[in-house]
Every structure is written in C-alpha cells, then in structure tokens.
From Swiss-Prot:
PANTHER family: ATP-DEPENDENT ZINC METALLOPROTEASE YME1L1, METALLOPROTEASE M41 FTSH. It comes from the Archaea. Belongs to the AAA ATPase family. The keyword Nucleotide-binding applies. The keyword 4Fe-4S does not apply. One of its GO terms (biological process) is proteolysis. Keywords: ATP-binding, Nucleotide-binding, Proteasome. It holds the Pfam family PRS2_N. The 26S proteasome is involved in the ATP-dependent degradation of ubiquitinated proteins. The regulatory (or ATPase) complex confers ATP dependency and substrate specificity to the 26S complex. GO terms for cellular component: proteasome complex. It comes from Methanothermobacter marburgensis (strain ATCC BAA-927 / DSM 2133 / JCM 14651 / NBRC 100331 / OCM 82 / Marburg). This is Putative 26S proteasome regulatory subunit homolog MTBMA_c13930. One of its GO terms (molecular function) is ATP-dependent peptidase activity. ATP binds at G164, S165, P166, G167, T168, G169, K170, T171.
Length: 372
C-alpha cells in the first residue's frame, strides 16, 4: 500500500497509475487555500454539511492542528479527522506547491457561494401573449396597484396563482406585466428555494422578499409551486421543505408588510397544492390551451418569423395542432419541421417536414412503460 496526501492506494485493488508530484518536505507552506468538497460517497444515513468558517482565525488553528506535517499539493485532498471525519477539502492553491503544512502556514477556507436573486428583464408585452384574457384582466388590476401601492393598502392584489398546462404563457405573462410597468421581476423556481440544509431555504425566502421590498414596486414569480407546496397527503414532509413552506406563508400573510410587492405563484397541478398554501392565494387564474382562433394567430405569428417559407396550409395546421400549447406548436412542431427541412437542404418547409414533426411529437408524447 502507498499513502499519499492522506489517501491510501492499494495496488491490488486498482491497476491505475497515480502520478505523484515530487514534494519537498523541508519546504514550509506559506499559504494553503481549501475548498469544501464533501464526503467520498453519500448514503441516506448522512448528509453533506454546508461548511462556513464563521471564525476564520479559529478554523485556521483547527486546520493546522490536524494537518500539520501533511503535504500541500494543489489538486490533492485533505480529509477532516475530528469534527467531520472523512469530509474532504480540496487544495485549490498551495504556496509553494508540494510543501509541508506547519504551525506557521496560513490556511484559508473558500466561502460557499450564496444564492443570489437577480432581476429578470424582458421586452415582452401583453400583446405578445395570445389569448388568456382572464389572466390579462387580473394583470391589469395588479398594474393599477403597483402604480399606486399606497392607495390600495389592505385592498391590494397581493397573492395570485397561475395554473394550467405547461407552455400556456404563465411565465410570459408575468414578464410582460413587469416589462410594461418597468418594475423589477424576480423569477425563481420553487425547487431552488430548497437549500442543502435545514435553514437555507427559509433564509433565501426572507432575503428574496426583503430584496423585493427594497426595490418595490416589484413582482415575485415563483414557478413550480407544487415542488414545495405539495399536499401533505402526497408526501412525507422533510424538515427543509417544511421550513421553506412556513417561511413562504409568513411572507404571503403579510406579517412583514411588503407593500408594493405582488407574489405570483405558478403550477401545472393546483389540485396537488396543500390547502395551507393554496388558501393564501386570493385568486386562481386558469391558463387554458389555445382554441382554433388563437392557434391560427400563433401559427401566423410564428411562421412570419421563420427563416424558411412554409408551404403548408395554416388552416390544416390549426386542425393538426388541436390540444397543443403555444410552446408545443412553436418548439415541437414548427421548429422540428424547420430543422428537418434544413437537414434535407430544402428551400422551404413542406408537407413532409410538418408530418415528420407531428409524428416525432406523437412518439415523444406516448407514455413510457416502467419495463421495456
């Protein structure tokens, strides 16, 4: 067996050759920069903790005490032997490289990057969203409120739920609302609010609403609400998810008066939402699949911008795309047909390309069996 950088290699277990960088044990490491990596493997009995050195001087003493005498080679790993046995730290920088850690070595721990929320900007207008008139009416009411939050106060439209099939324009309408008002839009997926450890998610939610309040009037759009707000009958609620839900309920209830902040939640499955969350939304707006006239408008709009002419009847396309969302029509029919035409080096999109796209969509839409 060979021990190198606190790792034991057994030649009987592996035939791989490990390049061992020559090190000078007499050279003292002046600086070592570490990055928390985690355990060599994971199992359901343990979770990889988030490492933050609250007291950097104390961490340096802790690190030197256990790794004194170890080789500091860039790209290698040091394993904790005390508080978190076998937790790995990668040596990002060692100066000089291949030197020895001593009592005089300065050891720095890289901080974990924290989730930051950024304003989403777009040039989409409500006229770009075809159909969904009920949702547009609600958005115009929200616009009235955000133009003069002090006038509405307790009568403000604070929490609204958008629901409906994927690709029906929920996110697009939220973007158009913020764009037309020129107010900040914070667009996030609910799954990103679940932190690595208990406490992370709640902190992120409070920071999100604090930021939205500071930049009010503003809109918070939370997509995939069912990822955190799933009815308790359908899940065994984990601690990290539970604290996210509680933090979200606190903000939506207005305990912290977030005047000028509107929360729009979005889900494809409103019936799966827990009543505690669903009841906080004052109104639910359904986004419906486009009808014949709406599909015709979408098709004409999309075809007009395509790089190749389309030699196929729009009226026939309206019939063939029945039951499809706007996103399906654009991404899975027209785009697939266009790419097929380009692959065939055809000067235009023809019937055979449309038929190919529709066939491909049907194949991808078929339910897959558990066993092949």
């Amino acid at each position: 067996m060979v021990k190198f950088n606190n790792i034991v290699y057994d030649p009987q277990l592996t035939d791989k050759k490990f390049p061992v960088k020559a090190s000078d044990p007499e050279r003292e490491a002046k600086l070592v920069v570490l990055q928390p990596v985690g355990y060599p493997f994971v199992c359901n009995l343990m979770e990889s903790p988030r490492i933050d050195a609250v007291n950097k001087e104390l961490f340096e003493i802790y690190a030197r005490d256990q790794w004194e005498g170890f080789s500091a080679t860039e790209g290698s790993y040091l394993f904790d032997q005390k508080l978190l046995p076998d937790y790995a730290f990668k040596i990002i920088r060692a100066h000089p490289d291949g030197s020895k850690i001593t009592r005089n070595t300065s050891i720095i721990l890289l901080e974990n990057e924290r989730e930051e929320f950024h304003e989403v900007k777009s040039d989409i207008t409500m006229d770009d969203v075809i159909g969904q008139e009920d949702a547009k009416i609600k958005c115009r009411i929200i616009m009235r409120y955000l133009e003069d939050p002090d006038r509405f106060r307790d009568w403000a439209p604070r929490n609204v739920l958008f629901h409906g099939s994927p690709g029906t324009g929920k996110t697009m309408l939220a973007k158009s609302l913020a764009n037309e008002l020129r107010v900040p839009l914070y667009l996030i997926k609910a799954t990103s609010l679940i932190g690595e450890h208990v406490g992370d998610g709640a902190r992120q939610i409070h920071e999100l609403y604090e930021l939205a309040s500071k930049t009010a009037p503003s809109v918070i759009f939370i997509d995939e609400m069912d990822a955190i707000g799933l009815d308790r009958r359908f899940q065994s609620l984990r601690g990290d998810v539970s604290e996210v839900v509680n933090a979200l309920l606190t903000e939506m209830d207005g305990i912290n008066q977030n005047w000028g902040v509107v929360t729009i939640g979005a889900t494809n499955n409103p019936e799966l939402l827990d009543n505690a969350i669903r009841s906080r939304f004052e109104e639910e707006i359904e986004f419906k699949l486009p009808g014949d006239d709406e599909r015709r408008m979408m098709l004409e709009k999309y075809i007009e911008t395509m790089p190749l002419d389309v030699d196929f009847s729009v009226d026939k396309l309206v019939k063939l795309t029945k039951g499809m969302s706007g996103r399906d029509i654009k991404e899975r029919v027209l785009k697939t047909a266009l790419h097929r035409a380009l692959a065939d080096e055809s000067p235009r999109v023809e019937r055979e390309h449309i038929e190919y796209a529709l066939k491909e969509r049907d194949l991808k839409s078929e339910p897959r069996h558990m066993f092949a």
